[in-house]
Curated annotation (Swiss-Prot):
Its EC number is 6.1.1.17. This is Glutamate--tRNA ligase. It catalyses: tRNA(Glu) + L-glutamate + ATP = L-glutamyl-tRNA(Glu) + AMP + diphosphate. PANTHER family: GLUTAMATE--TRNA LIGASE, GLUTAMINE-TRNA LIGASE. The gene is gltX. Belongs to the class-I aminoacyl-tRNA synthetase family. Glutamate--tRNA ligase type 2 subfamily. One of its GO terms (biological process) is amide biosynthetic process. Pfam families: tRNA-synt_1c, tRNA-synt_1c_C. Its main location: cytoplasm. GO terms for molecular function: ATP binding; glutamate-tRNA ligase activity. InterPro entries: aa-tRNA-synth_I_CS, Gln/Glu-tRNA_Ligase, Glu-tRNA-synth_arc/euk, Glu/Gln-tRNA-synth, Glu/Gln-tRNA-synth_Ib_cat-dom, Glu/Gln-tRNA-synth_Ib_codon-bd, Rbsml_bL25/Gln-tRNA_synth_N, Ribosomal_bL25/Gln-tRNA_synth. GO terms for cellular component: cytosol; protein-containing complex. Keywords: Aminoacyl-tRNA synthetase, ATP-binding, Cytoplasm, Ligase, Nucleotide-binding, Protein biosynthesis.
Length: 562
């Protein structure tokens, strides 16, 4: 829980005293002053663990702490008139990922800071280009609710509102501000690029209403008719000149079935933002060009525009594009949208990452600005660990076990309590003893990881919470019965002392060990692996010492955070 502070102090001063760590903790969390006595053994244990880390691990932990103290906390401020109503408006063609988290959190945080409302609006009026995933209608609200830890004040689905859009399109036609264009795409493009009106621009209102009625009845095929807003034919951007606001769609919508006419994105956005009372549109800077078209629509209706605030992208090296994820799923390279190698919110939830950690990272470290920012997973992990560590039991895990045989076993067994004729060691599950203990039998043959066994040849090791051992030599041991025997390489060792201070003074590596093990499967960011853990683990979220935090899922352990 406090390893980041310890690593920072170790790099800065070399030696770390518990009092120095406590000073840093109390400065940030004054309420812990009354619990100093409880903190000291926890900190002492974590100092021991950091002392055994290699320099790169220590630097990584220290960097996470440095970033939290270098960046002064700056709250997000926005211009406010009366009330604040914001919205997060995803397209359901895929599921939400860490990049969407910036939009969700900023919109929600700002709304709640100013006692306003936060609306989730699912934008699904482009079924040809962005075909909706039917399951997204259930999973997107679930993801949003998970991240903000409450239900949105309102959930709106645009495909439920087609009649509303039709009403306002007809209103513009009746006011002579919109018309039905029957030009082929290339014909209109030629008029537009020359700044000339197409032949349909000056049709009478009656003619346009009749054509509009035919569009709604499905009498036109795709591309034969669109509704255009009258804008500025001399506008410097040809794409703004009489841009379309509604078009024919022939394919059935996955959610509502066949509807001949759908509004285009910018029109539906303006109608909804106005009718829902959106006061602040907080969106990615890539939508700047849309603002020009939306402004023309607002002016056509005589409506006041909301306040626009823009932010940059939240980038990651993991796949986020919907088409890329779909391809990986089809190729069976990943299991689905919740594969933990993805940065989707459903995958992060599967890993057991706390939504509060992501939320705090967005508010404190990402913020509302136009800079594109690469996701700092270590910071998200840090915010997660400061919440979860104090309630997470610790266990041993070995990735590649090798047996060690204790030569002087008979000389040491009287140091342990005996249960059913077998000596055992009672080890706390956490520096906070309230989380309980587990009892591990002490046998003549124990197991350590092969990477630690190689170090044993160079200098003594300390088995965590047990004793110090030295290398004697390589041997072979036999497994099996009289019918089937297997020989296996092992290391003969001797117990040289039980003194932990001796290990610290002489810098013996402190390593994990197992008296027996249970083979399990790990699902990590680079795929599936085998590992060996203590048997009879009851909890579903644990900290495997030196390996990270893992969440149980059926018969395997899912990687959570390092």
């Amino acid at each position: 829980m406090y390893k980041e502070i310890i690593a920072y102090l170790k790099l800065k001063y070399g030696k770390v005293k518990p009092q120095s760590v406590i000073g840093k903790i109390i400065a940030k969390n004054p309420e812990l002053k009354a619990k100093i006595k409880e903190l000291i053994p926890i900190i002492e244990q974590e100092i021991k663990e950091v002392e055994q880390m290699d320099i790169e691990q220590i630097k990584e932990l220290a960097k996470a702490y440095e970033q939290t103290i270098e960046k002064k906390e700056k709250d997000i401020e926005i211009p406010v008139k009366d009330k604040v109503i914001t919205r997060f408006a995803p397209n359901p063609s895929g599921l939400l990922h860490i990049g969407h988290a910036r939009a969700i959190v900023l919109n929600h945080y700002i709304a709640k800071k100013y006692n306003g409302q936060f609306i989730l609006r699912i934008e699904d009026t482009d079924p040809d280009v962005k075909k909706p995933m039917i399951e997204a209608y259930e999973l997107i609200p679930k993801d949003v609710e998970w991240l903000i830890q409450e239900k949105p004040d309102k959930i709106v689905v645009q495909s439920d509102r087609l009649d509303i859009y039709y009403k306002y399109i007809e209103e513009l036609i009746k006011q002579g501000k919109a018309y039905v264009c029957l030009c082929k795409a290339e014909e209109f493009r030629e008029y537009r690029n020359k700044g000339l009106p197409c032949p349909h621009r000056n049709q009478s209102i009656e003619e346009n209403l009749e054509l509009w009625s035919k569009m709604l009845k499905g009498e036109f095929k795709k591309g034969e008719a669109v509704v255009r807003l009258k804008t500025d034919l001399t506008h410097k951007d040809p794409g703004v000149r009489d841009f379309p606001i509604a078009r024919i769609v022939e394919n059935p919508h996955p959610r509502i079935g066949y509807k001949p006419v759908f509004p285009l994105y910018n029109f539906a956005v303006v109608i909804d933002d106005h009718l829902l009372g959106i006061t602040h549109v907080i969106r990615m800077k890539e939508h700047t060009n849309n603002a020009i078209k939306q402004s023309f629509i607002y002016k056509a209706f005589g409506w006041e525009e909301p306040i626009y605030l823009e932010y940059g992208a939240l980038l990651t090296d993991m796949p986020t594009h919907k088409s890329e994820i779909r391809k990986l799923i089809e190729q069976k390279q990943i299991e689905g949208w919740d594969d933990i190698r993805l940065p989707t919110l459903i995958a992060l939830r599967r890993r057991g990452i706390l939504p509060e950690a992501i939320y705090e990272y967005i508010v404190k470290d990402v913020g509302l600005n136009k800079a594109d920012i690469k996701v700092d997973w270590n910071k998200i992990y840090y915010y997660h660990k400061i919440r979860i560590d104090k309630q997470t039991p610790r266990y041993f895990m070995i990735r590649d076990p090798i047996a060690i045989v204790i030569e002087n076993y008979d000389d040491i067994i009287d140091k342990f309590e005996i249960k059913n004729g077998i000596p055992y060691k009672k080890i706390s599950k956490h520096p906070d003893v309230d989380l309980g203990y587990r009892e591990l039998p002490i046998k003549e043959v124990l197991y350590i990881d092969k990477r630690d066994a190689e170090r044993l040849k160079q200098k003594p090791l300390r088995l965590f919470e047990l004793f110090n051992i030295k290398f004697v030599g390589e041997i072979e041991i036999e497994y099996g019965d009289e019918y089937s025997k297997t020989k296996e390489k092992a290391y003969a060792v001797r117990v040289i002392s039980f003194d932990v201070q001796e290990a610290i003074k002489n810098k013996y590596p402190i390593v994990q060990w197992l008296p027996e093990y249970e083979e399990t499967t790990l699902f990590e960011l680079d795929g599936y692996k085998k590992a060996y853990v203590e048997p009879n683990i009851k909890e579903n979220y644990v900290h495997f010492i030196r390996e990270g935090y893992y969440k149980r899922e059926n018969d395997k352990w899912i990687f959570s955070v390092k």
